[in-house]
A protein has these predicted regions:
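Short, P/G- and charge-enriched loop/turn segments at secondary-structure junctions
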Residues: 121-127, 173-175
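Gly/Ser/Thr-rich phosphate-binding loop
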Residues: 24, 46-54, 63-123, 136
Length: 204
């Protein structure tokens, strides 16, 4: 595989989820200093890119380019993260490019990926998929109890991917049972896919 990464390497999405996975799988990465829509498409063609790790503004910009389907003909996987991808952008992009964008949800404190539509196997506008293997996810109400199926609740995550706490004293990390609350509110649909609906609090 050849992966295009125009994301800043100081961000964990680029460093862990992109560069780290490239190294782990002995793939090739194509780096650019900054994102410029036409230049990025040219790099995809020049280096025969097969996978793209991106963020919503990239796909918004590309949606305005002519011949998008031809430019991305050799790409097998388009991934979006770091922010919510607007539903209309996802639908428009799929119409123009002829292939879907796969979304994920995560944060630095969780190394970073928590859920991904690649796990569920179906890209669904507005949803961020299911937990990665080895990651537990619960939705809880204000009393800390699990919510009823289909009801929104605060996200709690547990797994080896979760950090131990903030430097230097390790504060605000997981509880004694290993559960960490990112501060987001979501619900799970009948397929088991997660949809973010609110933000309960800021971590910092």
């Amino acid at each position: 595989d050849v992966v295009l990464c125009v994301l800043p390497l100081f961000h964990i999405y680029a460093l862990n989820a992109t560069l780290g996975m490239v190294a782990r799988n002995a793939a090739t990465i194509v780096l650019t200093q900054r994102f410029e829509p036409i230049a990025a498409l040219a790099a995809i063609d020049k280096h025969r890119v097969t996978n793209v790790a991106g963020a919503p503004p990239m796909y918004v910009a590309w949606s305005a380019q002519e011949g998008l389907g031809e430019a991305l003909a050799g790409v097998r996987l388009l991934v979006s993260g770091a922010a919510a991808l607007p539903r209309n952008v996802m639908e428009q992009f799929e119409t123009l490019a002829g292939q879907p964008i796969w979304e994920g949800y995560g944060m630095t404190e969780c190394s970073p990926v928590i859920t991904a539509s690649l796990v569920s196997g179906t890209p669904k506008p507005g949803f961020v998929g299911q937990p990665l293997p080895g990651i537990e996810l619960e939705l809880r109400d204000e009393d800390g109890d699990p919510v009823e199926d289909g009801d929104p609740g605060e996200i709690f995550v547990r797994g080896a991917n979760v950090f131990s706490g903030y430097w230097p004293e390790g504060s605000q990390g997981p509880d004694e049972e290993g559960w960490f609350a990112p501060g987001d509110v979501a619900y799970v649909d009948e397929d088991g896919d997660l949809r973010l609906v609110d933000r309960r609090r800021e971590l910092i």
